[in-house]
Amino acid sequence: GYRSKGISTYPFSAYIGVFALFGSLLGANLATDIDDKIFNKILSIIMIIVTLLILLSPKVLKGNLPERLKGKNLLKSCIIFFIIGIYGGFVNAGIGLVIMLFLSIYNRMNLVKVNATKSVVILIYTIGAFLTFLFNDLVDFGYGFSLGFGTLFGGWWASRYSVKKGERIIRFFLIITVVLLSFKLWFF
């Protein structure tokens, strides 16, 4: 993965991951039924907006500005990731794009570091949401293992490929994925 290629944002990723974990516990406990069609349309719009914001981020962020990972910026990031964790525990869908938006614009990370940090945060906060749903007997292990294996393999492969190929390939796959998923969510 990323660490084997020398990409790590530890301890920053651990701190924000723990705050996201606490948020996900709250979000998963607040989870309620939402009409699927309305939810899918809202999600497709959110995904497109977040992707556009990442791709069209202000030019000032394209420069050589230092990352913001310590001090008051770490504190602000922890608070925001608690809120992101609530959303992740409640809905989860599109969470990767929300995390990418914040890390790239506020923390000024390049997309390779964004993806490395996102992977750690999602791993940590998913534990809280999973345990909440498990204790409420809402886990389908057949689907879960299938999805988990695909995510694990895909994430490992993508991490190695993105470090090798850089930010440009991440942007390409981000656009393709969001367009296809948004189309599916809106029309199907």
Where are these regions (language model features)?
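Alpha-helical transmembrane segments and their membrane-interface exit regions
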Residues: 48-55, 102-108, 151-156
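Selective hydrophobic functional segments
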Residues: 1-38, 126-172
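Transmembrane helix exit motif
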Residues: 1-7, 45-69, 182-188
